[in-house]
Amino acid sequence: MKVFATDLDGTLVHNKKVTETDREAIAAFQKENLFGVCTGRPLSCLFDVEGIPFDFYIMCTGALLLDKDRHVIEEHLLDKELVRYIYNHYRDYSNIIVQTESESHFYFTDFIDFPTFTMIKDFEEIKDSKFYLNTHKPQVSEN
């Protein structure tokens, strides 16, 4: 048996969709092997891979591990005060995504357009108590 995990954006997902060829290859691979997803996205942002029965999920840049039924195997949460500190001190240097335990949405700074994201201006707007954190460096043009 082999185990294979894929990223989504720019790897499996192109132009917000998965090709039929990739879907067929995944189904064939899964007949004797395990196929999972490994992404920075939270669980609520898998809308463009609907219909792919992943055998495991590595979400939130490794902070959340789920089995095929989406039961938590392991999670690494951050304290709200630590997330607040990081957000307040580093938001000018990096695009910071603050992901919460809420599956319906999560909060972020201002650089990604996803239907399940809610933009915040102040960290105090976040009412959830469990946090994951992601950072993305702004892309720099090489002109």
Identify the meaning behind each predicted range.
Residues M1-K2, Q30:
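Extreme N-terminus of proteins, especially the signal/transit-peptide cleavage junction
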Residues K2, S94-I96, N143:
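Hydrophobic beta-strand segments of well-ordered beta-sheets in folded domains
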